[in-house]
């Protein structure tokens, strides 16, 4: 589960994951923390 600061971050993360990128990459890119 990703812990993003806001909806924008969550959308960013989901889009990134949809493009088959690693969780770590997406969380860093979108300012999210992996919990």
UniProtKB/Swiss-Prot annotation:
Residue pairs linked by disulfide bridges in the UniProt entry: 4-32, 12-30, 16-26
Keyword Kinase: no
GO cellular component, one term: extracellular region
Post-translational modification: Contains 4 disulfide bonds.
UniProt keyword terms in alphabetical order: Antibiotic, Antimicrobial, Cytolysis, Disulfide bond, Fungicide, Plant defense, Secreted, Toxin
Main localization of the protein described in the UniProt heading: secreted
Coiled-coil region(s): none
Its biological purpose: Antimicrobial peptide disrupting membranes. Has antibacterial against Gram-positive bacteria S.aureus (MIC=6.5 uM) and B.subtilis (MIC=3.25 uM) but not against Gram-negative bacterium E.coli. Has antifungal activity against C.albicans (MIC=1.63 uM).
A GO term for molecular function: toxin activity
Protein name: Thionin NsW1
Family of the protein in this entry: Belongs to the plant thionin (TC 1.C.44) family. 4 C-C subfamily.
InterPro entries membership: Thionin, Thionin-like_sf
Top-level taxonomy: Eukaryota, Viridiplantae, Streptophyta, Embryophyta, Tracheophyta
Compartmental location: Secreted
Gene3D superfamilies on file: Thionin-like
Signal peptide: none
Alphabetical GO biological process terms: defense response to fungus; defense response to Gram-positive bacterium; symbiont-mediated cytolysis of host cell
């Amino acid at each position: 589960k990703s812990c993003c600061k806001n909806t924008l971050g969550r959308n960013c993360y989901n889009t990134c994951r949809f493009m088959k990128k690693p969780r770590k990459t997406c969380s860093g890119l979108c300012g999210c923390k992996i919990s």
